[in-house]
């Protein structure tokens, strides 16, 4: 059986600890919806916190990355496929 793990990692400020979290989904579609939802929510937070549109976004089918232009604050959402028995 395959499961899809959404791994969230982020650093909010240069020198701060990198935080991680993971969620497991039974379909790739659910995992993709999760990273899209998380990415859009994070993007809104960036707009409010940074009070500008000065950030970078990279998106693919299994990856969502958002960061400020200095790279001091960033959020990643990745999907990893895992086979379990």
Residue ranges and their predicted role:
Residues 1-21, 38, 61, 79:
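Short aromatic-glycine-(Arg/Gly/Cys) micro-motifs in beta-strand/loop hairpins
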Residues 5-7, 31, 53, 63:
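A residue-level detector for conformationally permissive "hinge/kink" positions
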Residues 7-10, 26, 68, 81-83:
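Residue-level signal for short segments within beta-strands and strand-turn junctions
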Residues 1, 20, 29-32, 47, ...:
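N-terminal cationic amphipathic segment used for targeting or macromolecule association
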Residues 18-41:
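Short, flexible N-terminal segments of the mature chain
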Residues 37-85:
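Short, mixed-charge low-complexity intrinsically disordered segments
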Residues 3-6, 24-25, 35, 44, ...:
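Generic hydrophobic secondary-structure signal
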């Amino acid at each position: 059986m395959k499961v899809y793990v959404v791994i969230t990692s982020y650093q909010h400020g240069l020198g701060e600890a990198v935080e991680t979290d993971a969620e497991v989904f039974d379909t790739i579609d659910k995992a993709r919806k999760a990273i899209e939802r998380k990415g859009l929510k994070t993007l809104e937070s960036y707009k409010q916190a940074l009070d500008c549109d000065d950030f970078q976004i990279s998106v693919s089918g299994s990856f969502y990355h958002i960061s400020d232009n200095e790279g001091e604050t960033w959020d990643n959402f990745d999907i990893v496929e895992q086979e379990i028995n």
